[in-house]
């Protein structure tokens, strides 16, 4: 039995992950490959919607309960959308691709400070991943953009969806913030090891150029 190839797209907000996931899916399907794509969190089901709502309610109030709730939300998505596709005795797909995975928990669900509480929180999440034998991906494509481009994209996306720019928290997108988030991703990828490797891809340039870089890395 040939297991599906499991690819994760990670990156900061506004990095272009969703676009690149779709482009890769279309490219692979043009080769006759069977491709399943999902995202984490998957807000298309009611349970994930409820868990996400509760996670956001806990934000900045109780970092541990927020982290546990976020893990529960992601683990629910994993059990529903990902694990069955990877472990089926009769695989229905050649590729399983997700827009975000558990690595985002390490980057987004704790305040950006270095202290014992945060470190213990990281180890707590890592312990749960190992306890439940959560499957590591074969490869991670990490898309990165500079803060100015990130802010521009967040503003553009917020306006397109009719949102409130004043509530978009644009001040969080700074060089220092981005560096800290990437540092957390690297920690997570080192400790929750992927099978083959990861690549940092610049998401700031031309969409097609980024797509070509991703195809080259994945050798597809």
What are these regions (language model features)?
Residues 123-137:
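Membrane-proximal helix-turn-helix segments that form the acceptor-binding/catalytic region
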Residues 14:
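Walker A (P-loop) phosphate-binding loop of P-loop NTPases
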Residues 39-124:
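ATP-dependent small-molecule kinase phosphotransfer cores
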Residues 17:
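Conserved lysine of the Walker
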Residues 98-101, 133-155:
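Conserved phosphate-donor/acceptor-positioning beta-strand/loop module used by diverse small-molecule
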Residues 20:
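Hydrophobic positions on the alpha1 helix immediately C-terminal to the Walker A/P-loop
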Residues 148-220:
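NTP-dependent small-molecule kinase module
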Residues 9:
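Hydrophobic anchor at the beta1->P-loop junction of P-loop NTPases
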